[in-house]
Every structure is written in C-alpha cells, then in structure tokens.
UniProtKB/Swiss-Prot annotation:
PROSITE patterns in the cross-refs: ADOMET_SYNTHASE_1, ADOMET_SYNTHASE_2
Note on cofactor: Binds 2 divalent ions per subunit. Binds 1 potassium ion per subunit.
Binding site for K(+): E44
Annotated source species: Bifidobacterium adolescentis (strain ATCC 15703 / DSM 20083 / NCTC 11814 / E194a)
Primary role: Catalyzes the formation of S-adenosylmethionine (AdoMet) from methionine and ATP. The overall synthetic reaction is composed of two sequential steps, AdoMet formation and the subsequent tripolyphosphate hydrolysis which occurs prior to release of AdoMet from the enzyme.
InterPro entries noted in UniProt: ADOMET_SYNTHASE_CS, S-AdoMet_synt_C, S-AdoMet_synt_central, S-AdoMet_synt_N, S-AdoMet_synthetase, S-AdoMet_synthetase_sfam
Subcellular location, record wording: Cytoplasm
Binding site for Mg(2+): D18
Location of the region described as Flexible loop in the Swiss-Prot/TrEMBL record: 100-110
Main location group: cytoplasm
Top-level EC class: transferase
The name this protein goes by in its record: S-adenosylmethionine synthase
C-alpha cells in the first residue's frame, strides 16, 4: 500500500505573542502613513511578561503616540486584565526609534519632493531603487476559490473563527492566545482529497473542562468552517480532532512566551507550500521590497492561475539595493501549465507586470494605512478590497500577451 501524502499548515490567532507584535508594528506603520504617506518605517516590537519594547528606524513628517498605539492594539485583542496574563492599561512600553540610515535612503529616494512632483511617471519609477537586496516569492494554486493552498487557507479560517467565538461570547471562557493546524491528504497528482487532522489549541479560563471545550469548538468553530470551505470538494466525513493536546492552556500570550515581530513568516504566506526569501512584512513601509515585492509576486502568481495558464505557480523576484529593475524574475509552474509553455508565461509576465518598486507601490496603491488588517490571519487569500495584490485584474492582458 502506498504511503499517504499528508501536508500540514498552521495558523495562529491575533492573541499569539508573535502576532501581537506584528499587529503593534503594523498599527504604528499605519498611523505614520495616515499622516505622511511617504513615511519610511521599519518598526520591530518585542513582548515579554508585562512589557513591550518598540524599536527601529523611522523617517516621517508625522508624529505617533507609540504608547497609546501599543495599549490600544493590546486592548482590542483582548488582553485587558492580569487575570488573562496581560493588562493593556498597566503593561510597560519602552520605545527606541531612530532615523533611517541616510545611506539606505539615498538609494530609495533619489528625487527631492520638488523634483518628484515635476518628474514623469517613468522618471519616478527609475529613480526609486529597492530598499534592500533580497529574494521574494509569490504563489498561487487552484486548490481553493481564493487560489491559496488548502491547508493554510483552512488553518487561517479556523483561527479567525476561534477569535470570533471568543469575542462574541458564543463559546465562553476563552482567552486570546490560540493556534490551529490542518493536515490534508493529497493524491499522486498533488490534488487534495481528504481532511486528515484538525488541531486547535486555545487559551482558556482555569475552570474549563477539556471535554466540554472540545465539544464546543467542534460545534462552533470546526464544523462550520469545514462545511463552508471544503463543501463537497474534499472528503471530511472522518477526521481526527485534537483540542489542547497537552491538557490545560491557561497561561498564554506574552506571559507564557516572548513575542517578536516577523517570527511567523510561513503563517503569513503559504504555510510552507512555497519558498520564502526570509524577509518579514509587518512594520515595514512599501519601499521595503521584503513586503511590496512579495505582495506583487503573489499578484503575478494569482493572475497566472486565474487566467487558466497553470494549475499552480511560484514567482521569484530578486532585487539589488538602490536598483529599480529586478535582478531576476522566474516563473515556476511545476509542469502544470495549461496549453502554453512555462517560457511563454514568463515572457508574458515580463510584458504585463512592471516590478520596479515605485511601479508596484503605484499599481497596488500601497502608501495607504491598510496594514493592520494584514497582520493576523494571513497576508494572502483574503477577500478585502484593500488587499489590492489579490486582484485578478491582469488576466486579460496576460492572455493577450500569450497570443502575441
């Protein structure tokens, strides 16, 4: 008997300590972009027992009340009492922000404000180099309606629902920290065929009975999400459910584990289905190609799959600091291209998509304060108008470029 091919992916809730830090960093970024869309921001957050440290580099015409932003984010997540391990109103907040290095800035902003206002679009695109070197990846596949890998999409939906039932009180006695994990069986053609395991770990009040909790989460979180996402496309009549496998989960959040911005990069992207260049997203303005180019690569990949040119695709793009044009662009279709060659798809991508940093920022409208909502439950596969990199607005152009 052939060995089963089982693929897993995890997600975490907004109360996970690393995600708390991501949300703080992106809330600070949004506040600065709201005041000055040209802000250059690279903000990291670290969390430990009752204490947050915010540090990094910022160049902006705006002023942000960092202390208030931190407390607001923590409060909205649900850490409002020492009873749950963290009190937004009494936790310590230490801030250490400096200006962006002028050597980095000179490669990103070669035009002064007056020069930029007079420059043509092409001049602006050529003048703005990448904020750093690096390799970024984007991915899409036809396993789900949102063209994401099924394991990570399902894990995100479960994590989001877990937070929903906590906040609404539909399932009482839950606390903010939590994680989900999904295992899917694939056939020899790499198609998902069966749900194997659902794992949910959630922080809770001390008096909670674990058997009761498993029943509640199965009824109010797991089954509704599975019925909505899987429907009839993947077998899910029999699967294993694990809830808090170690037993109790009372102490959570930063009181149990230190948190740090950028430490959930696989959760943020494709759950391990694609490569990752290593650069995190949260706290970085769009001049940082770690973020903007990864968003653009997803945009490219999603349009390729939406155009029916391949069943799955990974787009790699690389940059040199201070240089506008990508050093390289590569499209990998894993032999799943449909009626075209991989080379034809790659040539079409080069014709249709301008992947210079300033062009990406313009095309995807990335200088807006939209990033807080990206900081939990995934940056990709979200059906939200502000997630412009999820638009399939280049499908027709790709098809025409293939014909040319």
């Amino acid at each position: 008997m052939a060995e089963l091919k089982l693929i897993s992916a995890e997600s975490v809730t907004e109360g996970h300590p690393d995600k708390v830090c991501d949300q703080i960093s992106d809330a600070i970024l949004d506040d600065m972009l709201a005041q000055d869309p040209h802000s250059h921001v690279a903000v990291e957050t670290c969390a430990t027992v009752g204490q947050f440290f915010v540090f990094g580099e910022v160049t902006s015409e705006g002023y942000s009340d960092i202390q208030n932003i931190v407390r607001s984010v923590v409060r909205n997540i649900g850490y409002t009492s020492s009873r749950v391990g963290l009190d937004a109103d009494s936790c310590g907040v230490t801030v250490s922000l400096t200006e962006q290095s002028p050597e980095i800035n000179q490669g990103v902003a070669r035009l002064s404000g007056e020069e930029e206002s007079k420059a043509s679009r092409e001049q602006r695109y050529e003048a703005q180099g990448a904020g750093d070197q690096g390799v970024m990846f984007g991915y899409a596949c036809d396993e789900t309606d949102v063209l994401m890998p099924l394991p990570i999409h399902l894990a995100h939906r479960l994590a989001y629902r877990l937070a929903e039932v906590r906040k609404s009180g539909e399932v009482p006695h839950l606390r903010p920290d939590g994680k989900t994990q999904v295992t899917i069986e694939y056939d020899d053609d790499d198609h998902p065929v069966r749900l194997d395991t659902v794992l949910v770990s959630t922080q809770h009040d001390p008096e909670v009975d674990q058997a009761w909790l498993k029943e509640q989460l199965t009824e109010h979180v797991i089954r509704p999400v599975l019925d909505d996402v899987l429907a009839d496309r993947v077998a899910h009549d029999e699967y294993r459910v694990l809830v808090n496998p170690t037993g109790s989960f009372i102490l959570g959040g930063p009181a149990a584990d230190a948190g740090l911005t950028g430490r959930k990069i696989i959760v943020d992207t494709y759950g391990g289905a694609a490569h990752h260049g290593g650069g995190a997203f949260s706290g970085k303005d769009p001049s940082k190609v770690d973020r903007s180019a990864a968003y653009a690569a997803r945009w490219v990949a999603k349009n390729i799959v939406a155009a029916g040119l391949a069943h799955k695709v990974e787009v790699q793009v690389a940059y040199a600091i201070g240089v506008a044009d990508p050093v390289s662009i590569n499209v990998e279709t894993y032999g799943t291209e449909i009626g075209v060659t991989r080379e034809q798809i790659q040539q079409a991508v080069r014709k249709v998509f301008d992947l210079r940093p300033a062009a990406i920022i313009d095309e995807l409208d990335l200088k807006r304060p939209i990033y807080s909502k990206t900081a939990a439950y995934g940056h990709f596969g979200r059906e939200d108008a502000d997630f412009t990199w999820e638009a399939t607005n280049k499908v027709d152009e790709l098809k025409e470029a293939i014909k040319a």
